[in-house]
Amino acid sequence: LSQVPICPTGYRNEAKDQLVGEQIDLMLRKEAVEVVPGPYPGEGYYYRIFLVQKSSGKWRPVIDLKRLNKSLVVPRFKMESITTVWNSLIPGNYTFSIDLTDAYFHIPIFPGHRKYLRFVYQGVVYQFKALPFGLSSAPWIFTKVMTQVKAMVHIQGVMLLLYLDDWLVQIGDYNTGTLQSSYMVELCHRLGLLVNSEKSELVPKQQFQFIGGQFDLLNNRVYPKEQNMTKLLQVIEVFLTSSFRTAREYQSLLGLMGSQDRYIQWARLERRVPQRFLLDNWNQFRDSQDVLLPVPPHVKEALLWWKRQHVSPLGVPLVPPQFTHRVFTDASTKGWGAHSGQLQ
């Protein structure tokens, strides 16, 4: 805690510094922050505020709360994931989605605690009066509050899935979906929740994107999102046109593959080729992250397989088919074996 305002916010780049000022003015209009009039009574925590560019190209102000976050204990909590959403979806159903604008700013900060969330810009002291981005407990707080909305609408028969400010509602038919969509928008309005009409999909659909996947409830399929595959293919193209890449780049490639392999049939098997090559030729405890490794023909052949998946995507079943056979296998340094029915 400091009696004197410290950590002034500012960029040497004049254009970026102007963007910071514009975002602070915007937060003032949204009543997310407030000016602390001087002289400054009592103590406060002062931090730097910076901008993070969103996928839309717009800017999000984030306060650097690393020091405060070290003192916070965030309880464990359940939040929707791609797995829970996937398991909840039913082929043939419809969905619509709601995206909230400035989600965290819907949660007010207790007046006595706002002094812990201060920053200085051009000699003026500000403090957050709404939940800021950058606080480690923010996802937990926001989810706990919005879970009450979820419980309320479940009583009304609305199947709502929450992933922070991205909401997905599943319904059995189109007409019911239009009614529930209108109900949810009206409810958000009554609760003071701002709906982002540009990013929301309020018309019931059977083909939609949510979190990391492209879902097709009509044909019982799930595909990777186009932008995620494009990012992966850009890295693959670099490897295909190179003779050597660093171990760090190999790990980045494998990480991108791992994020998409659940959406692509046999992807985990094909990922094993570059993964095995890295394990055989590099030791993370001994070798540098920047050591150069070759990109041999068999690795490039495996990468071409991934490239073909983007040209002709097959996806994976939303609901897997019933199994007709069970095969049990085991292996050791001395041998291997398999068992299926009466066959061994």
Predicted regions and their residues:
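C-terminal reverse transcriptase regions that engage the nucleic-acid substrate
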Residues: 73, 127, 202-318
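Reverse-transcribing Pol proteins
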Residues: 1-77, 124, 161-166, 264-300
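Reverse-transcriptase-like RNA-dependent polymerase core
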Residues: 1-4, 52-60, 101-126, 142-151, ...
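Catalytic palm active-site di-aspartate
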Residues: 64, 99-101, 134, 155-174, ...
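RNase H-like nuclease fold core
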Residues: 316-344
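Conserved catalytic palm subdomain of right-hand nucleotidyl-transferase polymerases, strongest
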Residues: 56-69, 85-109, 249-252, 327-329
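Conserved pre-motif C helix in the palm subdomain of viral-like polymerases
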Residues: 27, 58, 93, 104, ...
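Active-site palm subdomain of RNA-directed nucleic acid polymerases
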Residues: 37, 139-188
